[in-house]
Amino acid sequence: AKSAAFYEIPEGGQEELAKDIAAFVQELIAFGAVRRELGCPVGTCEGRLEIAGLEIAVYGAKGCIPKQLGAFLSADDNSGKKMPDLTLELAERMPESHQNGTLLIRNKDLTVCTWEEGYVLRFDALENIYEIWMKEDGSYARIYYRRPMKEEEQDSLFLAIRPVFLFLAQRKGMFALHSASLLYLEKAWLFSGPSGMGKSTHTALWKKLFNTPYLNGDLNLIGK
């Protein structure tokens, strides 16, 4: 409005001017001439997750939060007033540009590079996940993706979110352990070992003999 007043644009033409400027900026973004900085999510918050004491605000299209995370949706009416530990933007589109940087990790499943704002992650094994742009401190991540078209793509978004969360958890003093866990005498008991060792079989035996509730059959987060 200040610019319009400075250039003496009539009030009736200001709306059209705003549309023209927005279209021009979108063209610059599309050609990679400019980009939107991490930390400015588009749209409204679709929900808040609370996992291991960490608050995650999720922005994206309606219904974008994977069903695997439904149990962690916060029911706290005041959660929206808190500053989240992680802001997660789920962008259902291809990235407008590709960021290059120093290569840190490359294998058949994952490529990680550093760049000026943090890290770029690419998952060659997840066809509908284009890229993840993440801040260096893990406080913000934008996941570029498309909706799953095949059965094997249904879990891809959840699998892409997991390393982003685990990176933040590590910075908060927690670590993940490949293990099966159960609840016994008001404490969590973890059984860890290589795949195929019988962790799930062991917890199933406890369930059968002592009716102990399962906590997790694959990955457990450990911290203070």
Which residues does each PLM region occupy?
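C-terminal structural segments of small proteins and small subunits
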Residues: E16-E27
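Hydrophobic positions on the alpha1 helix immediately C-terminal to the Walker A/P-loop
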Residues: H202
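Short alpha-helical segments in extracytoplasmic peptidoglycan/chitin-binding modules
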Residues: A1-S3, L28
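Short helix-coil junctions and helix-kink-helix linkers
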Residues: S3-A18
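A noncatalytic interaction/capping subdomain that flanks phosphate/NTP-handling catalytic cores
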Residues: A22, A30-W189, S195, L205-L215, ...
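Short strand->helix junction
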Residues: P10-Q14, K150, G196
